[in-house]
């Protein structure tokens, strides 16, 4: 937050403006910096039995329309500077289905709030909107409810798409 748009393009977004071959090389070397939506799209494809043929991401600056004070950063972000970014990941599959996800992380102005907005286009089109979700609590609950699966997982690296569905566990 606080970067001018041209600084954002140079320091953040330019990392996405590479060829598929360059991206594959970075992934092989462990030097690719994906947004956290990158893994979500792959997970969804795996759970739906889809086969990924290509995946791209784009970082889009979120620009302040007026000065915004951030108590967390203890700074004022001037109008026209970045308040954060949107990560847009587009995944195309062998089956002809495209999954596009976007996650916006930014400093909110006084009239903004967290919102989960999911649209599934198909038959029928479906949209789910959750305004002001308990983001911190949901994130913590997801981690806590995974402890049993992590402890019971096979040795080595296991991706979450290979684990059982993450469900709430009630303990007596």
PLM ranges: what are they?
Residues 107-172:
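C-terminal helical cap and adjacent loop that interface with cofactors, partners, or active-site loops
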């Amino acid at each position: 937050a606080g970067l001018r748009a041209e600084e954002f393009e140079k320091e953040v977004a330019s990392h996405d403006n590479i060829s598929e071959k360059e991206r594959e090389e970075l992934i092989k070397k462990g030097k690719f910096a994906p947004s956290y939506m990158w893994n979500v799209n792959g997970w969804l494809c795996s759970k739906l039995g889809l086969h990924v043929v290509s995946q791209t991401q784009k970082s889009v600056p979120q620009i302040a329309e007026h000065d915004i004070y951030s108590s967390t950063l203890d700074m004022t972000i001037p109008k026209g500077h970045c308040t954060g970014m949107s990560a847009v990941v587009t995944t195309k599959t062998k089956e002809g289905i495209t999954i596009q996800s976007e996650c916006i992380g930014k400093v909110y102005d006084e009239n903004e709030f967290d919102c989960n907005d999911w649209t599934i286009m198909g038959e029928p089109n479906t949209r789910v909107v959750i305004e002001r979700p308990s983001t911190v609590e949901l994130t913590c609950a997801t981690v806590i409810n995974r402890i049993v699966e992590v402890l019971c997982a096979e040795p080595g690296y296991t991706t979450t798409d290979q684990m059982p569905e993450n469900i709430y566990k009630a303990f007596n």
